[in-house]
A protein has these predicted regions:
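Hinge-like oligomerization/junction regions that interrupt long coiled-coil arms in large cytoskeletal
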Residues: 2-195
C-alpha cells in the first residue's frame, strides 16, 4: 500500500511487516482512525506526530521492530501496543459551551479493537468551531485540557496557544478523506453514466 507522507522509519517497518518479517504490526494510527473531511484538519492537528505512531499487538512486537530499526539504522518510531494502551476520557463536560463541536475521540471512526488507542490519543481533546470559542472554553475550564479548532489552531492544556497557517489537505487524514470523497463521487458518476447508457 502507498505510504506517501510517512516517515522512512514507518515505511521500513511496514515493508518488513508486509513481507512477514515483523509480526503483530497493525499499521500507522492515521490509517486506523478515520475522520470525515470537515474534521480531518482538527483531528490531524490533535494527533500531531502520533498520526505516524504504529499500532501493534504486544510489547514483544514493538521490541522486535525497534531492534530491526536499530540494527538497520532505520530511524525511530513510537509503537502503541494494544496490550498496554488504555484510553482516558475528559471528566469535564463542555458540551453546552458556545462553539463546542465535540470530543475529538467521538468525531472519528475506527474498528472496536482500536477504541483505547483513539481514546488515549483523542479522548482528552475538545474540538471547537474557532479560536474565540476555543479560548473561551479553555479559560472556563482552567486550561485543564487541549482545545483544537476546526482550522487547526490549538489552545494547549496549561494555556499556551499554537497556530498559524497550514496547507489545507496536506496531512495524512485530510489526504485520505479527500481520496474517499473522490472515490464516492467517481462511483456516483460511473452509476449515472451506466444509467444514461442503459436508457440511450
Amino acid at each position: 500500500r502507498n505510504l506517501d507522507g510517512f516517515a522512512q522509519s514507518v515505511k521500513a517497518v511496514m515493508k518488513e511487516a508486509g513481507r512477514g518479517a515483523l509480526r503483530g504490526i497493525h499499521g500507522p494510527v492515521s490509517r486506523l482512525i478515520h475522520a470525515q473531511a470537515d474534521y480531518a484538519l482538527a483531528i490531524e492537528t490533535a494527533l500531531g506526530a502520533a498520526a505516524q505512531n504504529l499500532v501493534c499487538d504486544r510489547d514483544e512486537d514493538a521490541k522486535r521492530a525497534i531492534r530491526f530499526l536499530k540494527e538497520t539504522h532505520g530511524g525511530r518510531v513510537t509503537f502503541l501496543p494494544l496490550s498496554n494502551i488504555r484510553g482516558t476520557r475528559l471528566r469535564e463536560q463542555p458540551s453546552g459551551e458556545a462553539g463546542f463541536v465535540g470530543i475529538a475521540a467521538d468525531l472519528v471512526t475506527y474498528e472496536p479493537q482500536y477504541a483505547d488507542i483513539a481514546e488515549s490519543l483523542l479522548g482528552r481533546t475538545v474540538i471547537a468551531e474557532d479560536m474565540d470559542d476555543a479560548t473561551a472554553i479553555a479559560r472556563k475550564y482552567g486550561y485543564k485540557f487541549r482545545v483544537v479548532t476546526l482550522d487547526g489552531q490549538v489552545v494547549n492544556a496549561g494555556g499556551s496557544l499554537t497556530g498559524g497557517s497550514s496547507i489545507k489537505g496536506a496531512g495524512l487524514l485530510s489526504r485520505r478523506a479527500e481520496i474517499e470523497k473522490l472515490q464516492a463521487e467517481a462511483k456516483t458518476l460511473t452509476a449515472k453514466a451506466k444509467e444514461a447508457t442503459d436508457t440511450y
